[in-house]
Amino acid sequence: MLTLSKFHVILIPILFFITLLSPLFSIALPINIWPKPRFLSWPQHKAIALSPNFTILAPEHQYLSASVTRYHNLIRSENYSPLISYPVKLMKRYTLRNLVVTVTDFSLPLHHGVDESYKLSIPIGSFSAHLLAHSAWGAMRGLETFSQMIWGTSPDLCLPVGIYIQDSPLFGHRGVLLDTSRNYYGVDDIMRTIKAMSANKLNVFHWHITDSQSFPLVLPSEPSLAAKGSLGPDMVYTPEDVSKIVQYGFEHGVRVLPEIDTPGHTGSWGEAYPEIVTCANMFWWPAGKSWEERLASEPGTGQLNPLSPKTYEVVKNVIQDIVNQFPESFFHGGGDEVIPGCWKTDPAINSFLSSGGTLSQLLEKYINSTLPYIVSQNRTVVYWEDVLLDAQIKADPSVLPKEHTILQTWNNGPENTKRIVAAGYRVIVSSSEFYYLDCGHGGFLGNDSIYDQKESGGGSWCAPFKTWQSIYNYDIADGLLNEEERKLVLGGEVALWSEQADSTVLDSRLWPRASALAESLWSGNRDERGVKRCGEAVDRLNLWRYRMVKRGIGAEPIQPLWCLKNPGMCNTVHGALQDQ
């Protein structure tokens, strides 16, 4: 137990550069909160013990109450011991008995743009800390911050006192995409990912559920899609699984955004409905054909036939089931990589083209037949950028109403973001040059001669590997010159495509690289002078990575442990903590 005089010097973790009194003045202080808050003041550098009877006092709420219970248990059980210790004055006169949570508007739903701001204060001389938020979701962000300020072994827990934090995100959409079609992930894997996202203040789990390789989602109105299109009967997601994941997301302040990729990437639909899928189960790149004549961009062929009335009967059933199972207000309809060669294998489509029709008109017909139906279900439609920007098959903007359509980038870095914004569309940034977490792991084709080429990137089309530094330093609104353009950038997502990933590598592929995205989209990647702070962030991210591991997240290391125990010794210039 703690036996102290008026003040007692104890040891707490290094290293957090906080804003002290003024956002223009920073000094090194031993608090590590990830992502870094927008404003933090701790002028007296004092700490107090947490009462053995500490409680969190919060109003009852369907989702916040579960969060309060979770954080109370975490605070008592985490037993976080700092890897590096620095002295701080611990006050003896009293202990912190409770955290009082106040939410001004519990009616605010978990959707894009909801207020996630919070204010957190632990006054000197008070038995209570205070957390004020406009929404339940902002309160959850504040609870996470509070949990990260606590260290010690229960019941001897400590935290800073005389501290004030005012915090809110720069971008409303901060997400992780996980592809569960190419390889299957268990429900526990998905829930663990959502838990880690919440700890990093990420708020959108983009669930790329289906693709050509499998259709793992059991739908009440179309059960044959999963029965015949999944990778196996034990590799499906039932309605009960979906309900559990969605509920878990709400309890962690994470939206679950479903993606049913169409009309491309639908080979798995052909197992149940071969009559609505063109080029299903054909070899993806026929012998003697050029790349332009391929049937798919990777193994797993199949695209929905826009000329078949049966297509829309099935698709609308799928949409209705998705709307019923997912309360999320965004519906991701895919729309990427519609390949000309696949559609051209169908006689009816060839007849349409011979009569003067175009492939782009086929895409427009599909969108015109599905987008209004999605909108009628009170959903905003998200498509990949291809529907507007593809060089061969794209839709006229007239069929993509800006008030109902959001586009997600994945090519050409900031250039495609600029093009989408210039066209007046809202955009979610997932540039493969920066945010694709599968890149740099080689290829998966069995006999690709590119592996023998010295400058091939090891067979990975999007090599090199996207480091946490690359992710952290990327400015998603780069080159947008005015505030109106920047407002159209909703945020960003890192993407884990699963050609070479499954549950065995899930945590290490995501973390802590997704943590780098989390801070850059929450509080930015620059210091108060406008200088990139990647160099300063490395120690903080390293500490956060170790804490995530203690919380059960298998985040990969970013440095030798020796570097963390010897601050500054692994820099390129001794004592240099800022990027120039």
From Swiss-Prot:
Q: Which UniProt keywords apply?
A: Cell membrane, Disulfide bond, Glycoprotein, Glycosidase, Hydrolase, Membrane, Signal
Location in the cell = Cell membrane
This entry's Gene Ontology molecular function terms read: beta-N-acetylhexosaminidase activity; hexosaminidase activity; UDP-glucosyltransferase activity
The record places the active site at: 337 (proton donor)
Cleavable signal peptide: 1-28
What EC class is this? Answer: hydrolase
EC code(s) of this entry: 3.2.1.52
A Gene Ontology biological process in which this protein takes part is: carbohydrate metabolic process
Q: Which CDD domains match?
A: GH20_HexA_HexB-like
List the GO terms this entry assigns under cellular component, sorted alphabetically. plasma membrane
Regulation (activators, inhibitors): Inhibited by N-acetylcastanospermine.
Q: Which Gene3D superfamilies does the annotation name?
A: Chitobiase/beta-hexosaminidase domain 2-like (3.30.379.10), Glycosidases (3.20.20.80)
Q: Which cysteines are joined by disulfide bonds?
A: 279-342
Task: State the superkingdom.
Answer: Eukaryota
**How is the activity of this protein governed by pH, according to its UniProt record?**
Optimum pH is 4-5.
What does the sequence similarity comment in the record state about its family? Belongs to the glycosyl hydrolase 20 family.
Q: What does this protein do?
A: Has a broad substrate specificity. Can use synthetic substrates such as p-nitrophenyl-beta-N-acetylglucosaminide, p-nitrophenyl-2-acetamido-2-deoxy-beta-D-glucopyranoside (pNP-GlcNAc), p-nitrophenyl-2-acetamido-2-deoxy-beta-D-galactopyranoside (pNP-GalNAc), 4-methylumbelliferyl-2-acetamido-2-deoxy-beta-D-glucopyranoside (MU-GlcNAc), and 4-methylumbelliferyl-6-sulfo-2-acetamido-2-deoxy-beta-D-glucopyranoside (MU-GlcNAc-6SO(4)) as substrates. Removes terminal GlcNAc residues from alpha1,3- and alpha1,6-mannosyl branches of biantennary N-glycans without any strict branch preference.
Provide the protein name: Beta-hexosaminidase 2
Query: Which organism is this entry from?
Result: Arabidopsis thaliana (Mouse-ear cress)
Question: In the UniProt record, what gene is named as encoding this protein?
Answer: HEXO2
